[in-house]
Swiss-Prot record:
This is Phospholipid phosphatase homolog 1.2 homolog. Belongs to the PA-phosphatase related phosphoesterase family. Disulfide bonds: none annotated. InterPro entries: P_Acid_Pase_2/haloperoxi_sf (IPR036938), P_Acid_Pase_2/haloperoxidase (IPR000326), PA_PP_rel (IPR043216). Glycans are attached at N162. One of its GO terms (biological process) is phospholipid dephosphorylation. Its main location: membrane. The keyword Protein biosynthesis does not apply. It is found in: Membrane. Its EC number is 3.1.3.-. Keywords: Glycoprotein, Hydrolase, Membrane, Transmembrane, Transmembrane helix. Residues 284-308, 322-341 are annotated as: Disordered. The chain crosses the membrane at residues 30-50, 71-91, 122-142, 223-243, 257-277.
Length: 341
């Protein structure tokens, strides 16, 4: 978990520190964000531990057998990385080839090296997607430790002592009990609420679907490709979520809450971090950048008078139009130097 947090931090810093005029301020904000997230993810579980909840002896919802994961945690991480990265790569490549082929794309530099605009966009948008992913993981870990809900297979891995539920009152709530099963399985069996697989899979599906809608929907003539792609993403995400029920890892309510949290975090990330649906982020890639022509150097008395008037009332008709895409920042776009008349 800590390795993934560090990876996300360096990816975003690398992609943004030289590409925006506010790179230093933004980098500091990201550093504080990931530092706080990592601290919460590590410190809170260590201090609080997992909540030790009791159970009813006749509770059939925690008597299911233990099964292995259909989708492991490693596979879930790969799903997140591949889906988001492949989506950004395909969409941005299509835009560059079909939509922006006649537009001068901005040139980017990092440590005196030129970077391709596709590489920059891939790191930028993918980095934004990982911000919400890290928030998702951190929130899930803290919630699991605080709530401590028992998984459906809890009794199967706990292996209670023989005298725990032998009394006549089967509906008695047990708080003092001892598990004789493997400690690592017993510990994991106390982390049912809420489903991390559901939250992550629906976060990735929702973020990718919104990204396609914002970046590809307005420029793609075919009205079938985008809905089909979005439907497939949600089908995969829901399939991963529902597998947690069939694997006896989560109750249905755990999966449902995970789905809603994943969707909410995806919408939040797209709106407030990635800023996909802002007019500024979409129009800046199609609008020309206007640079006022510098006033001419006076050569005689008439030119001196005209120069004085131009300095007071500069004409907008003499502007130089430079087509550019992407954020209009002086650190990211190398503009041609206008020549004096």
């Amino acid at each position: 978990m800590r390795d993934h947090v560090e990876f996300c931090y360096y990816v975003i810093i690398y992609s943004l520190e030289k590409f925006q005029q506010r790179s230093k301020q933004f980098g500091i904000s990201l550093f504080i964000f990931f530092l706080a997230t990592a601290a919460v993810t590590v410190i809170v579980p260590t201090l609080l531990g997992v909540s030790q909840r009791g159970f009813f002896c006749d509770d059939d919802s925690i008597r299911y057998e233990y099964r292995k994961d259909t989708i492991t945690a490693v596979q879930l991480m790969l799903y997140n990385l591949v889906l988001n990265a492949a989506t950004v790569l395909f969409v941005e490549y299509y835009r560059m080839q079909k939509v922006e082929s006649n537009i001068n794309n901005p040139r980017y530099r990092w440590r005196n090296n030129h970077l391709h605009v596709l590489f920059v966009r891939l790191l930028t948008y993918f980095g934004y997607s990982q911000i919400g992913f890290v928030m998702n993981i951190a929130l899930n870990i803290v919630t699991k430790h605080v709530v401590g809900r028992l998984r459906p297979h809890f009794l199967d891995v706990c292996k209670l002592a023989n005298d725990t539920c032998v009394t006549g009152d089967s509906h008695r709530y047990i708080t003092d009990y001892t598990c004789t099963g493997p400690p690592e399985l017993v510990l994991e069996a106390r982390k049912s609420f809420y489903s991390g697989h559901s939250a992550v899979s629906l976060y990735c599906a929702t973020w990718s679907a919104l990204y396609i809608q914002a970046r590809l929907g307005p420029v793609l003539n075919n009205r079938i490709v985008v809905p089909i792609s979005q439907t497939l993403m949600f089908m995969i995400g829901l399939g991963i979520s529902f597998s947690r029920i069939t694997d006896n890892k989560h109750h249905w309510s755990d999966v449902l809450v995970g789905i809603f949290i994943g969707i909410f975090l995806a919408v939040y990330t797209c709106t407030f971090w990635t800023d996909l649906f802002s007019n500024n982020s979409t129009e800046s890639e199609t609008q020309p950048l206007l640079l006022p022509r510098p006033p001419r150097t006076p050569r005689n008395s008439e030119d001196e008078e005209r120069h004085r008037l131009d300095a007071v009332l500069p004409s907008t008709d003499s502007s130089i139009v430079f087509e550019a895409t992407g954020p209009q920042d002086s650190d990211t776009i190398l503009l041609p130097v206008p020549q004096s008349a």
